[in-house]
Amino acid sequence: MKKIISTLTILAGSLAALPAQAAEGVQTIPQVTNEWRGAVTPYIWATTIGGSVAYEETKLASVDYRARDIISHINFAAMLTLEAHHGRLGAMADIVFAKLNAQKSEILGKPNLSSNTTVEQGIYTFAATYTIYNTKNTYLDGLAGVRVMNVVSRTDLKVADSVYGASNSNAKSSTAPIAGLKGRVRLGDSNYFIPFYIDVGGMAQGTQVTTQQMIGIGHAYEWGAATIGFKNLYNRQKSSGITTTQSLSGVVAGLSIRF
């Protein structure tokens, strides 16, 4: 919690130079109408990754990677939120995909052998939405949908100065239902607002719990909005007595383009 508060304090300060009064023609809070409306939001998520593996009550392994460590191994990444509404009904999708490539390294005690590991992870959230509450200062959607998580890993072994080698790949996928809330609250009469998101789900395909939260601060413009905040995703799965957890958290920044 202290980390989130500290992050948001710094982020809020970075927006302090923007105009405090509301500008004409700017829609800070979305309004329900009988026409189609929507937004496309590409964003950057500087996430850390933590996790653990346990058998029954015995912890077998744990990992903790900082954002700078992850960035140095990224081959490709895409992060995008899409949403569309007609009246109070709507739909949304949140897409996170990353391909990481570990540096080649010699295998201990085997100087003629080297390995290269590639990991692809996709986190896809799809939901139907319904606007529960809407005023000039507050917007609140309820949502229900699914979260799909895919992980594909591949390790290649190579014998130095030869064509010989071996490879092994593994793929895992899980789908779990989720439900939650999302929206924004306007700050006074300005174009500043607080965006928020929370969902929780699980109890399907071995997924015990999956939950995601985001809170931040944003500024609305005629074309859309700029937001910065803190995002966290937690997932716990259990199968055949083996429990795995994964936690992704970090600063998120995006530009939302309205249409």
Task: Spell out what each predicted region is.
Residues N34-W36, I74-A78, E120-Y124, T138, ...:
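Residues that define the transmembrane beta-barrel architecture of outer-membrane proteins
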